């Protein structure tokens, strides 16, 4: 119940959420691993072996194993977005908020990123995604809510 949430509890609530941004939000002067370490350290992780294992785990989940030492400018847009998804998974969130995760990607790369999100969802994670790409909504049937004119509507879809 958010109406009774104390301000001091907000950081703990945030840790239950993973966020995927449209424009990746990677630190350009840090490697993939350093980007992920930054988040782990900021959320209280201290053991190097545990952090290394967690980074390897999330990079593997998004198909980026072997990219830990790459810099963001060495990655394609889709690869950067997969690192963003890995970052969102670091603290094992209950919900992943994805704000236009395919908005800056070409159609083929968008499908690849959606496949990563679909697999994460199939493994039990709730993903709340905002998108303007109706073709992706049709390709990946799920519970879909449409916001229009200040009102919310549920869109009923047929599964194929």
Q: Can you say where each PLM-predicted feature lies in the sequence?
A:
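ABC ATPase NBD coupling module
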Residues: 2-18, 48-49, 120-122
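Helix N-cap at the start of a conserved alpha-helix in ABC-type nucleotide-binding domains
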Residues: 107-109
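Conserved catalytic motifs of ABC-family nucleotide-binding domains
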Residues: 92
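Conserved ABC ATPase "signature" region
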Residues: 1, 37, 41-44, 48-67
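Catalytic Walker B motif of ABC-type/P-loop ATPase nucleotide-binding domains
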Residues: 96-99
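Conserved ABC ATPase signature
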Residues: 71-75, 79-81
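Short coil-to-helix segment of the ABC ATPase nucleotide-binding domain corresponding to the Q-loop/switch region
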Residues: 30-38
């Amino acid at each position: 119940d958010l109406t009774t949430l104390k301000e001091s509890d907000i950081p703990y609530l945030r840790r239950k959420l993973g966020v995927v941004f449209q424009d990746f939000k990677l630190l350009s002067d840090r490697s993939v691993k350093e980007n992920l370490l930054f988040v782990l350290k900021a959320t209280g992780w201290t053991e190097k072996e545990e952090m290394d294992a967690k980074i390897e785990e999330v990079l593997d989940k998004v198909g980026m194993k072997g990219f830990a030492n790459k810099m963001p400018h060495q990655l394609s847009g889709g690869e950067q977005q997969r690192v963003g998804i890995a970052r969102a998974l670091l603290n094992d969130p209950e919900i992943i908020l994805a704000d236009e995760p395919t908005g800056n990607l070409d159609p083929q790369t968008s499908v690849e990123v959606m496949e990563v999100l679909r697999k994460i969802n199939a493994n039990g994670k709730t993903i709340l995604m905002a998108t303007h790409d109706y073709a992706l909504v049709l390709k990946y049937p799920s519970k879909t809510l449409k916001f229009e004119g200040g009102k919310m509507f549920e869109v009923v879809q047929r599964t194929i």
